[in-house]
């Protein structure tokens, strides 16, 4: 088949605030540079630069807590849709009263 089926019996990665440590890492297939960084991680963390620490974090997690807590713009869609339907209903009521 064309579409790959998910096996839900295996652990999956998910970013959730109430479950901060997922069962598996975000990046499943590491590149050569990422593998080298994972080997360097086993040594002292004081020898790692800040960029390397951030890269290690991004291998394990997709988003930070700040990114997870960031608000979305979905409310604009909800308000716009509700306003559209209220206006459409008002037009129908005015049309019914006139004719």
UniProtKB/Swiss-Prot annotation:
Listed GO CC annotations: mitochondrial inner membrane; respiratory chain complex IV
Record's bilayer topology term: Single-pass membrane protein
Disulfide partners: none
Main localization, broad class: mitochondrion
UniProt key word Mitochondrion: yes
Positions bearing N6-acetyllysine: 4, 28, 35, 42
GO biological process per UniProt: mitochondrial electron transport, cytochrome c to oxygen
Top-level taxon of origin: Eukaryota
Stretches assigned to the Mitochondrial matrix side: 1-73
N6-succinyllysine carried by residues: 4, 35
Cellular compartments annotated: Mitochondrion inner membrane
Keyword Repeat: no
Phosphoserine carried by residues: 31, 33
InterPro entries: Cyt_c_oxidase_su4, Cyt_c_oxidase_su4_fam, Cyt_c_oxidase_su4_sf
Biological or metabolic pathway of the protein: Energy metabolism; oxidative phosphorylation
Keywords: Acetylation, Membrane, Mitochondrion, Mitochondrion inner membrane, Phosphoprotein, Transmembrane, Transmembrane helix
Membrane-spanning segments: 74-99
Assembly mode: Component of the cytochrome c oxidase (complex IV, CIV), a multisubunit enzyme composed of 14 subunits. The complex is composed of a catalytic core of 3 subunits MT-CO1, MT-CO2 and MT-CO3, encoded in the mitochondrial DNA, and 11 supernumerary subunits COX4I, COX5A, COX5B, COX6A, COX6B, COX6C, COX7A, COX7B, COX7C, COX8 and NDUFA4, which are encoded in the nuclear genome.
Family: Belongs to the cytochrome c oxidase IV family.
Function according to Swiss-Prot or TrEMBL: Component of the cytochrome c oxidase, the last enzyme in the mitochondrial electron transport chain which drives oxidative phosphorylation. The respiratory chain contains 3 multisubunit complexes succinate dehydrogenase (complex II, CII), ubiquinol-cytochrome c oxidoreductase (cytochrome b-c1 complex, complex III, CIII) and cytochrome c oxidase (complex IV, CIV), that cooperate to transfer electrons derived from NADH and succinate to molecular oxygen, creating an electrochemical gradient over the inner membrane that drives transmembrane transport and the ATP synthase.
Name of protein: Cytochrome c oxidase subunit 4 isoform 1, mitochondrial
Record organism: Trachypithecus cristatus
